[in-house]
A protein has these predicted regions:
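Glycine-rich phosphate-binding active-site loops on the catalytic face of alpha/beta enzymes
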Residues: 165-166, 214-233, 267-293
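Catalytic cores of alpha/beta
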Residues: 144-154, 203-216, 241-255, 259-276
């Protein structure tokens, strides 16, 4: 399908589960031939089925899902990953759709700096007609560059976080200098933000050790939608196994990865998530202009 916006790289599968976009990086696929993307999607079904076997299915289905519990994921790379003709065409529609649905907003970072600045500009534009701020997630650049970025985003930010898992992300590899952050560096970053601090990309035992030491305001469980080279596994299973421990060291848990339906959202909330984040379905819904239908799949009030 070709439109004035470009050509969507998503294959528009009937079920978005990571099997239709194998090897598509750049694009909307994942590393390891999409393995973690696939496991993320399957993980919510497995958790629900396990709960169902214990007689807890009705308890999960009874959980009310309202827009305030959902966020659009932090997304950049509209040209190379999504298929937009121009990077600037993506951010305002994507964030505006989420804001109008009542969802929280997340804004991502990328290379070149224009990508972050376009996200900032979109949030600024939204504030001409509503009052809204976003959670901004910065790539793990060297500290001085991060401090500069904090100044760009702080007026429009409700939360500021770092993608700790993206220091070796395939789509930015060899383009910029990214670092694997230490606890001391994260503490230094946090002190500069002066806002609620999020560690995004928590998915391994090493990440858990960082959380214990830093004790952020928010832990964001993520494997970058299966797009970073990390251990094999699903965010759903990590949430189920680690939520009770993580709660000791943070105020909230956010999670993404494979969220497609209301039942997925309910399952995430049941297993300990405070906020549930979706990206690929909302990207496609923005491009194809069927956002209302996608919202109905994710929630009810």
């Amino acid at each position: 399908m070709v439109t004035k916006m470009g050509e969507l790289k998503c294959h528009r599968c009937a079920v978005c589960d990571g099997y239709g976009c194998l090897g598509m990086l750049p694009g909307l696929g994942g590393v390891f031939e999409g393995k973690n993307f696939q496991l993320n999607c399957e993980g919510w079904h497995e958790l629900f089925d396990a709960a169902l076997a214990r007689g807890l299915g009705d308890e999960i289905r009874a959980i009310s899902v309202c827009p305030q519990q959902l966020r659009c994921g932090p997304v950049t790379g509209a040209v190379e990953n999504i298929g937009y003709a121009r990077e600037a065409d993506f951010y305002l529609p994507y964030l505006s759709n989420a804001a109008k649905a009542g969802f929280g907003l997340c804004v991502g970072d990328g290379c070149p700096d224009e990508k972050l600045k376009l996200g900032v500009a979109a949030v600024k534009e939204l504030n001409h007609t509503m009052v809204v701020k976003a959670a901004f997630f910065l790539k793990p650049y060297p500290q001085e560059k991060l401090f500069e970025r904090i100044e760009w985003i702080r007026p429009y930010a409700s939360h500021i976080g770092i993608d700790i898992d993206s220091y070796n992300i395939v789509t930015m590899r060899n383009l910029v200098n990214l670092e694997r952050k230490t606890a001391a560096q994260l503490e230094d970053f946090r002190n500069h933000t002066k806002l609620p601090f999020v560690i995004k990309g928590v998915f391994t035992e090493d990440d858990l050790a960082l959380v214990r030491e830093v004790q952020p305001d928010v832990v964001y469980i993520s494997n970058h939608g299966g797009r970073v080279e990390t251990r094999i596994g699903s965010t759903a299973q990590f949430l189920a196994e680690k939520a009770s421990e993580l709660k000791k060291y943070c105020k909230e848990i956010w999670v993404d990865g494979g969220i497609r339906t209301k039942q997925d959202v309910q399952t995430a909330l049941y297993y300990g998530a405070d906020q549930v984040i979706a990206a690929r379905p909302l990207i496609r819904a923005t491009f194809d202009e069927h956002y209302t239908e996608t919202v109905k799949e994710l929630m009810s009030c």
